[in-house]
C-alpha cells in the first residue's frame, strides 16, 4: 500500500485532519526541497557579500532579514503539512521578498566591488526563486503547473477546493442535460430531480464493518429508520444517540443503492490519474486502474462515492482522480 493511500485512508477515518511534525513532508516534496536549497545557498551568498561590502544599502539588509523570515516560515509550514492553509500568506510574503530582492539586485549589480557583485548575484538567485514561489503558491492546486509539480511529490496531487466548487456549481446543469458518453455508459437520464447527499454523511466512519452496518437493519438491534418525504423523494436518516443526522458508511452507500437513477446519484465523470488497490480490510473501498472512467458523486470531501462501469460502487480517494468536463471527448 502506498504512502498516499495510507494517508488518505487515515484522513477518511478521522473527521478532522491531524497535522504532525515530520521531515518527510519536506524531504518528500522535490519542489519544496530543491527551491529551498537554492534559496538557502543564494541567501548565504548574499549575506557573505553584504558582510564583506563596505557600503551595503540599508534597504538590502532589511531584504536579507525578511527573506530569512520567509524561508523559516516556509520550512515550518511544510514540516507541519500546512501548505494548503497558508498558501495566501506564502504568496503574499514571497511577493514582498521579491520586491526587496529585485531592488537590491538593481542597486548592487552596477557596482565595481567584487563583494557587491557577489551580493547582487545572490539577490538575483533569490528573485528567481521568489518568482517561482509566487506562481506556485498564488495558484490553486488544480492549476496545470501545480498538478504537474505535485505529481512528483510522495503525497501526490493536492486536493483543490476551487475545482470541487466549480464542479458543484455545474452539477445542476450536468444532471438536467445528459451528455452522450454518459448516456451510452449508463443508459440515459430520465429527468429525475437531483438528490444530493452532503459530505457530512461521511462522518462516523468508525463503523467500517459491513456486517454491522445499520443502513437496512431489520432486527430489533438496528436503529430506528425514518423515511423523510418532503418533495416526493425518499431519504433514509439513521437515528443516533446524540440526535444528529450523521450516518454511517453503510447508510450512505445504502442511499446510493436505493435512490434510483445512477446519473442522479453520480452526476460527475472522473478519470483515474493513478491505479488504486482497495484495502482488503475495508469493504467500502473499490479498486480501479489508471485511465479508468468512473461516475462519482458527493465531491466535497477527500473520499468520493463512485461507481464503476461494471456496476461496482464504493468510495475512492479524490486525489487519485480528476473530474472530466466533457465525457464525450474521452
Curated annotation (Swiss-Prot):
Keywords: Cell membrane, Membrane, SH3 domain, Stress response, Transmembrane, Transmembrane helix
Family matches, as PANTHER family: FCH AND DOUBLE SH3 DOMAINS PROTEIN (PTHR15735), HIGH OSMOLARITY SIGNALING PROTEIN SHO1 (PTHR15735:SF20)
Domain SH3: residue ranges: 265-326
Residue numbers on the Extracellular membrane side: 52-58, 110-116
Transmembrane residue ranges: 31-51, 59-79, 89-109, 117-137
A molecular-function term among this protein's GO annotations: MAP-kinase scaffold activity
Entry membrane topology: Multi-pass membrane protein
Assigned protein family: Belongs to the SHO1 family.
Principal location class: membrane
CDD domains assigned: SH3_Sho1p
Name of this protein: High osmolarity signaling protein SHO1
Gene3D superfamilies tied to this protein: SH3 Domains
Location(s) in or outside the cell: Cell membrane
Segments on the Cytoplasmic side according to the record's topology features: 1-30, 80-88, 138-330
Record's subunit section: Forms homooligomers.
BP term (GO), one: regulation of actin filament polymerization
Species the sequence originates in: Eremothecium gossypii (strain ATCC 10895 / CBS 109.51 / FGSC 9923 / NRRL Y-1056) (Yeast)
Pfam families linked to this entry: SH3_1
InterPro entries listed in its UniProt record: SH3-like_dom_sf, SH3_domain, Sho1_SH3
CC terms in the record's Gene Ontology section: cellular bud neck; HICS complex; mating projection tip; plasma membrane
Amino acid at each position: 500500500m502506498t504512502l498516499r493511500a495510507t494517508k488518505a485512508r487515515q484522513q477518511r477515518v478521522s473527521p478532522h485532519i491531524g497535522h504532525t511534525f515530520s521531515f518527510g513532508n519536506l524531504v518528500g516534496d522535490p519542489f519544496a526541497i530543491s527551491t529551498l536549497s537554492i534559496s538557502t545557498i543564494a541567501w548565504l551568498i548574499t549575506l557573505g557579500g553584504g558582510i564583506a561590502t563596505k557600503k551595503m544599502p540599508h534597504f538590502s539588509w532589511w531584504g536579507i532579514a525578511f527573506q530569512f523570515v520567509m524561508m523559516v516560515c516556509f520550512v515550518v509550514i511544510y514540516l507541519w503539512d500546512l501548505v494548503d492553509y497558508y498558501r495566501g500568506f506564502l504568496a503574499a510574503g514571497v511577493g514582498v521578498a521579491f520586491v526587496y530582492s529585485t531592488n537590491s539586485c538593481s542597486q548592487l549589480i552596477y557596482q565595481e566591488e567584487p563583494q557587491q557583485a557577489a551580493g547582487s548575484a545572490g539577490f538575483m538567485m533569490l528573485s528567481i526563486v521568489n518568482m517561482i514561489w509566487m506562481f506556485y503558491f498564488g495558484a490553486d492546486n488544480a492549476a496545470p503547473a501545480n498538478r504537474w509539480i505535485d505529481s512528483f511529490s510522495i503525497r501526490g496531487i493536492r486536493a483543490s477546493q476551487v475545482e470541487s466548487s466549480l464542479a458543484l456549481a455545474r452539477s445542476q446543469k450536468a444532471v438536467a442535460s445528459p451528455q452522450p458518453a454518459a448516456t451510452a455508459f449508463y443508459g440515459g437520464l430520465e429527468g429525475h430531480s437531483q438528490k444530493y447527499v452532503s459530505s457530512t454523511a461521511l462522518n462516523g466512519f468508525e463503523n467500517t464493518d459491513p456486517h454491522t452496518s445499520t443502513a437496512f437493519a431489520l432486527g430489533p438491534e438496528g436503529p430506528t429508520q425514518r423515511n423523510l418525504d418532503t418533495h416526493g423523494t425518499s431519504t433514509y436518516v439513521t437515528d443516533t444517540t446524540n440526535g444528529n443526522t450523521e450516518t454511517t458508511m453503510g447508510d450512505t452507500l445504502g442511499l446510493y443503492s436505493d435512490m434510483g437513477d445512477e446519473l442522479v446519484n453520480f452526476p460527475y465523470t472522473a478519470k483515474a490519474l493513478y491505479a488504486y488497490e482497495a484495502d482488503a480490510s475495508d469493504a467500502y473501498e473499490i479498486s480501479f486502474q489508471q485511465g479508468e472512467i468512473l461516475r462519482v458523486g458527493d465531491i466535497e470531501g477527500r473520499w468520493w462515492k463512485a461507481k464503476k462501469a461494471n456496476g461496482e460502487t464504493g468510495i475512492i480517494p479524490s486525489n487519485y482522480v480528476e473530474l472530466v468536463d466533457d465525457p464525450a471527448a474521452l
